[in-house]
Amino acid sequence: MPERKTLQRAARDKKQGKSASTQAGEFVREEIEHVREGKHGVRSTKQAVAIGLSKARRAGVDLPTPKKASASTRRKARQDSEAAHDGHAKSPTRARATTRALKRESARPASKSALSRHASKSASRRTAADRSAAAKKAAATKGAAGRSAAAKKAARTRAANRAAAHH
């Protein structure tokens, strides 16, 4: 069960009109914190992220099922989204079994270096078109003041890069 503060943060994100993946990010962060605190371990960074996303779906975050994922991942995602609405309590026996299994795993995949490796690997998989679309969406949802600040920062970065190239 997600902590109350995580649910509140996700609700606040939703109220502010932020995307489903931003809301789900709160659950992933909570999962990483749990591993760092030693509540349980994970086999890989990817697993920690997957657990966070699963919890988000079960808490009612409207995350779409991933198109490029394997059939079993898509099935699990669909199952989680349905579980948000079916009102069944989770069986304590199964919950205990999963926690015990995770307790045997390591905390290393939640370290700063592991997360950094995972993030750069994921980022390198994104296409230029994907990045461009994300930037356009960000500009559209930023508002005038935010846009002008972003433009100033971009101009400053361009100038700095130009200066660095001449040296």
Give the location of each predicted region.
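A charge-rich, low-complexity, intrinsically flexible signal that marks solvent-exposed coils, linkers
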Residues: M1-H167
